[in-house]
Amino acid sequence: MKCSILSALVIFAVSNSGFAKSLNVYGDVQVTDIQPTSSFIWERENKKSPLYPIELARSGIVGCAVMSFDISESGKAENIEVVKSVPQKSLGKYSSQILKKWNWIPTSATNAMTSEKRTIRLDFCIGDESTEQSQNACKQQTQLVCG
């Protein structure tokens, strides 16, 4: 009896280990400026897409967050507020963490000592086939209303 239960557990573990290894998740985060849409005083120093938070990927959470914040004279995001976070509040929490890590640089020397109010949207998308799939899904998602 013990041998048959042990054998069944071993077969189950071996058959499912291949499935777990083959499951890939590709994440993408798209950043869209809402306000202002042009004539920026500050721009992100590193314009790469933010990394998809691993906790969100593990949970399969996708959605969007609209964030409002100030960029200080020193180029740091301050007064960060979650305007909308769909479908879960956790997207706003992770979006705040992303914003706090960004460094901002003035678009011109005359703008260096001026603060700026910004509103942006972050779209979090995942796919199981490729990075391109998740990027395409995110481009489509940015066309939808967040909330």
Protein language model regions, located:
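Sec-dependent signal peptide recognition
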Residues: 2-8
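Charge-biased low-complexity segments
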Residues: 19-147
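N-terminal signal peptide c-region/cleavage motif recognized by signal peptidases
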Residues: 15-17
